Amino acid sequence: MSRSRHVGKIRKRLEDVKNQWTRPARADFSDNESARLATDALLDGGPEAYWRALSQEGEVDFLSSAEAQYIQAQAKEPPDAPDSAGGAESGPRGLDSCSLQSGTYFPVASEGSEPALLHTWTLAEKPYLKEKSSATIYFQMDKHNNIRDLVRRCISRASQVLAILMDVFTDVEILCDILEAANKRGVFVCVLLDQGGVKLFQEMCDKVQISDIHLKNISIRSVEGEVYCAKSGRKFAGQIQEKFIISDWRFVLSGSYSFSWLCGHVHRNILSKFTGQAVELFDEEFRRLYASSKPLMGLKSPRLVAPFQPNKGPEAPNGRLSGTSDSASDRTSSNPFSSLSTGSNAHNQSLSTSSGPSSPLAPIPPTVPRLQPYHSTRRAVAPQPLLVPMRPHEGAPAPYSSLMAYRPTRLQLQQLGLVPRVTHPWRPFLQALPHF
């Protein structure tokens, strides 16, 4: 009987705020039961049931028109019919599985290959653990550091892995940058795309005629936000509005920027660059979302052992990443990738040329000692692991690491028995050499 005279939590607070003589109450962050009942009514019965629940609970209309339309459009029926075996026990069990995302995805995913694959990321040695924490902010007004150019530069300079979480992906040029990094440089790319943006992404791929055959080293997966479940079992999923890029586990680009033409040219956005311990938080969030994602295009179950394998030797990560935390001026400069700026000296330019697709923040590698003449060719040229780029500081062979390089060509051929030792003294250079 007293249910109709009940005053909702939001309505009561509005009345207190409007009355200037009322003392401010303590902030209450508990759940609003009236709002939950009204949302369940909207999910089960539509707008009329929603208004009826608001009237019974004495609550104000707390949903915007866009939110109400989204809930009705994304509503899904429960996977199991309520008439199935189990009776009343099926209701609470279905509610628990829907409301607790960790209880839904992780126990199921831990039995497959993907969670074990993600678990190797934790065991791998991360370069960001040796970096000093820093943060740099970029705005759209900075014409010298266009946000779109910074994102594309990050993709073009990746050398091992790119982990991308995005809500909208319709920029064809950024797609070309990702395809070039994966197909030309062997960079493993994993893109987690919001379920709401899947249709637009597939539309872009159809326009430019991109299919699975072009995504040999790319894994594109769809992911949803949190799941809201009513007591009846009907549910709807939220959106992924997080956007960030993890490049080689060294730094993260995060902000409001989406992979679209409007965001690159018209919309105003903000972009933040994080290094150091903050990268680990983004890595953990990416792995959690990866565990609940579904394959969309490209690799269905990628084997990340080769791309994610840490560098051989304990000194390789230090030598490659110490330049990012040497000075504060490098972290707070106008250009986050100082080696790509036009004012770089000749030494930095030669470094970026020799290191290929290595990081733009990589320091000058130490000089590789030349091997002694008694080292053999087989010992100097060691087999490299698959998909790991060669770098001067990772044990690459020196240019002159063999005894054969210090001897004339004719003496080398004589040792192999390919050239007769007796030649005419007056015609030493006319002797025909055998062709291999």
Swiss-Prot record:
Alphabetical list of SUPFAM superfamilies matching this protein: Phospholipase D/nuclease (SSF56024)
Region (Disordered): 73-95, 302-371
MF term (GO), any: identical protein binding
Lineage: superkingdom: Eukaryota
Region (DUF1669): 1-298
GO cellular component: cytoplasm; mitochondrion
Subcellular location: Cytoplasm; Mitochondrion
Tissue specificity statement from the Swiss-Prot or TrEMBL entry: Widely expressed, with relatively higher expression levels in adipose tissues, especially in epididymal and inguinal white adipose tissue (at protein level).
Entry keyword set: Cytoplasm, Mitochondrion, Phosphoprotein, Proto-oncogene
UniProt modified residues of type Phosphoserine: 301, 329, 350, 359
GO biological process, one term: epidermal growth factor receptor signaling pathway
UniProt feature, compositional bias: Low complexity: 350-359
Bias (Polar residues): 321-349
Domain notes: All members of the FAM83 family of proteins share a conserved N-terminal DUF1669 (domain of unknown function 1669) domain of about 300 amino acids. This domain mediates the interaction with casein kinase 1 (CK1) isoforms. Therefore, it has been proposed to rename DUF1669 the polypeptide anchor of CK1 domain.
Similarity section: Belongs to the FAM83 family.
Quaternary assembly: Directly interacts (via DUF1669) with casein kinase isoforms CSNK1A1, CSNK1A1L, CSNK1D and CSNK1E.
Its biological purpose: Involved in mitochondrial maintenance during adipogenesis. May be acting by playing a role in the maintenance of normal mitochondrial function.
Protein name as it appears in the record: Protein FAM83A
Organism of provenance: Mus musculus
Gene: Fam83a
